[in-house]
Amino acid sequence: MTAADLEEVIAIESDSFPRPWTRDHFLAEIDSNRSLPLVAKNREGRIAGYICSTHVLDEGEILDVAVRRDCRGKGLGRMLVTTAISTLTARGVSSIGLEVRASNASAIALYRRIGFETVGLRKNYYENGEDAFLMAYTINDSEDRADAV
């Protein structure tokens, strides 16, 4: 992801979330050495989805992921998440966490299919009082690390 991608990224973000990230938030992720902001483009060169993840020492976190509405249900979200896992694993991460709205059944199902487990709950986490599930993915041993790359 680069600053040139932000117009399309912000449009997807605004369509996907009730409280979207701002341009400044995305710019901070682009500029951070620990962040891994990635975009996926379609054949026409339009951004179809993106993911922002970060890492500190051996812990990674998926911060934001969204797929353009007309591209959903085609495996792009899975590809973005598994690419982030592979990239974070290559950087020495042994676990990856994320927070997801309790009502976001499709995202929760996707994360579970990939191997994330629900490990906690943040009550009233979002502005509207909605809870967030805490989910985690663990890279168990060197074999898993090699497979993830």
Question: Where are the regions that the model predicts?
Answer:
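C-terminal "cap" of GNAT-fold acetyltransferases
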Residues: 94, 101-105, 124-149
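Glycine-rich phosphate-binding loop
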Residues: 75
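Short hydrophobic clusters on alpha-helical segments that form packing/core surfaces
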Residues: 84-88, 96, 107
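Acetyl-CoA-dependent GNAT
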Residues: 3-70, 78-91, 120, 138-149
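Conserved short alpha-helix immediately C-terminal to the canonical SAM/SAH-binding motif I
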Residues: 80, 104-107
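Residue-level recognition of the GNAT/N-acetyltransferase active site
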Residues: 68, 72, 101-103
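Conserved active-site tyrosine of GNAT-family acetyltransferases
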Residues: 111, 116, 135
